[in-house]
């Protein structure tokens, strides 16, 4: 069975963020980047299936500019067998449908049986690419997976996280697309041996012309009008004194603000 993991390079959450001049995205100057956290769990799940002898090949794919190659190198060092980089500045940073369309075109002749990806991206939280890819392929789709297991060669059992901590168990017929939650496993890290081996693993680089797409095919349908930081809260009041004095002052403040107590 051939498998594919969809990965995205996103800004490191520890970076210092500020808006760009247009107020439509963050200023990417001097940001550090990493593999989207949700996608790390998807990769680990496929590597576990490969370790168990149920998957023959794990391929990593990303859509983005030249810098996105770093995410693929991380996946290769962690254990993926090869990678596909859809690299074109016309696609980089586009909307979910355009990204899904590029993925669909890139894998048309690959013959994958299982495609995993993260439930969402840490930077934009669109939660759409996996479902759109499944729709373009006309494959079954399951989202928010917290556990996966192969029932047989053609059936994947998926435990899905629902609201109120409920879990739904569904069987999907392969080939299929599944997006996964964080916390479903413990992602492995690249070893020195893996980092060295990654340098010899193949990375196929595809542009729009290779996908038989042109600029009108990748014209974004979604445009960010504005982006704003969360409103700043009012400064906290620090209560001082003995424990009894602080407790009385706290009760007084609650009574003033809410009318209870």
Where are these regions (language model features)?
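N-terminal glycine-rich FAD/FM-binding segment characteristic of electron-transfer flavoproteins
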Residues: 1-261
């Amino acid at each position: 069975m051939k498998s594919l993991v969809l990965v995205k390079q996103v800004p490191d959450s520890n970076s210092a963020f500020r808006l760009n001049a247009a107020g439509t995205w963050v200023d990417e100057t001097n940001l550090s980047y990493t593999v989207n956290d949700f996608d790390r769990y998807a990769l680990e799940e496929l590597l576990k299936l490969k370790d168990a002898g149920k998957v023959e090949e794990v391929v990593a794919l990303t859509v983005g500019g030249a810098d996105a190659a770093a995410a693929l190198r991380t996946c290769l060092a962690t254990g993926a067998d090869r990678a596909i980089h859809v690299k074109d500045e016309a696609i980089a940073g586009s909307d979910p449908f355009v990204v899904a369309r590029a993925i669909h075109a890139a894998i048309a002749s690959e013959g994958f049986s299982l495609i995993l990806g993260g439930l969402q991206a840490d930077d934009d939280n669109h939660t759409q690419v996996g479902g759109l890819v499944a729709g373009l392929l006309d494959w079954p789709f399951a989202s928010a997976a917290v556990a996966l297991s192969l029932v047989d060669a053609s059936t994947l059992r998926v435990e899905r996280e629902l609201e109120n901590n409920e879990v739904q168990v569904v069987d999907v017929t392969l080939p299929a697309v599944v997006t996964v939650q964080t916390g479903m496993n413990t992602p492995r890290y690249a070893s020195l041996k893996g980092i060295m081996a990654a340098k010899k693993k193949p990375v196929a680089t595809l542009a729009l012309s290779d996908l038989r797409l042109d600029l009108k095919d990748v014209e974004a349908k979604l445009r960010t009008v504005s982006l704003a930081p969360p409103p700043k809260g009012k400064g906290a009041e620090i209560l001082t004194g003995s424990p009894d004095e602080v407790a009385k002052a706290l009760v007084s403040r609650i009574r003033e603000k809410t009318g209870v107590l």
